[in-house]
Each structure stands twice: as C-alpha cells, then as structure tokens.
Amino acid sequence: MRTPRAFTLVELLVVIGIIGLLIGILLPTLSRARAASNRTACAAQLRDIGHAFTMYMNDSRNKLPRVNTMPSMVPPPADNPPSAVQVLQPYIKGATNVWRCPADIIRKPSPGSPAGFDTYFDREGLSYQYNPMLSSSNAGMPLEKTDYYQRYHSLQLVVIFYDYEPFHGKAGKPGSTNYLFADSHVGDME
C-alpha cells in the first residue's frame, strides 16, 4: 500500500517564504498608493475651497475677507474676526468634509485637549492655513492692490491657502505640501 504524497516541511517553508517576500514587496507599494490618494483628495478639496474663495471675491467686489487665521488662539484678537470656514462655508454647498485633509493625522501637543494631542483640524476646524499675508492689514482690499500681489503680478503665483503641515512627505521636499493659488489651481511650490 502506498502512502499519499504530502508536502514536506521544506516545501511548506519555501512557500511561506515566497508569500512573505511578496507581502514585503506589496506593502510599501500600497502605502505609496494610499499617500498619493490622500494628496489627490487634499488637492481636490483645496480646489473646492478655491472656487468658494472666488465666489466670495465676486460677491464682495473683489475684496479680501477678514478672517482669523488661528481661531483657537487664546486670547482671541480684540475684534475677533470669523474663521475662514465661517466666511467661505456658505459658498460650499452642503460639503463640510472639504475642510479636512485625509492626511491630517499629525498630532501636536495641545494643553487643552484631554488626550494631550490633537490635529490642526481638531484645533482650528480646517487642515489648511489661510495665507497670513492676505489677512489683517490687507483684509477688505482688492487682491490686486496688496503688496503681496504686487510682488508677483500674477494670480498664478499668489498663494491663498496651503496645507498647514507637510502632510504628504518630509518638510521642504517637493510634493510635501499642497498650495492653492489665486487662480484656483492647486500645486506645489517650485
């Protein structure tokens, strides 16, 4: 009588090793794909914010909004202007998720948070920073009259919003931060 043929221990270990090797190759690729997906989602959301900003500018005779760039700041400024979310949300029909970048998972120490850490979105209500060069002294002015615009003379070079943190890579590296420009395109700083 012949015994049924079975896999030997060596054959099973070889198969397990090959599967482990394939997983080792695929996981970094999947991680890069997820990061690229998050960057694209953030860029699309910034583009939506850019369209809302353009609609606001059209309604306000091309004058820049007065916004508080850090609403969580304590104490608030004396006049305490509204946040960018409060100013632009009426122009973003029903979508509230545009204010949070899916890659905004960087946690910073925060004494007010029960856990001790929170994201920029948790503190400020958005993952993007309104360009401080356009707020305060330039608020209420037409964009083209600001010193910031006069430096570049092009809507394609004037940054309106940007990722608060380098969500998409190491700081200073190309592709680590999305920037929304005044012409509503989203890109990287060259």
Regions picked out by a protein language model, each given a short descriptive name:
Residues 2-44:
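Amphipathic alpha-helical segments typified by the pilin-like N-terminal helix
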Residues 40-190:
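Short, well-structured segments within or immediately adjacent to enzyme catalytic domains
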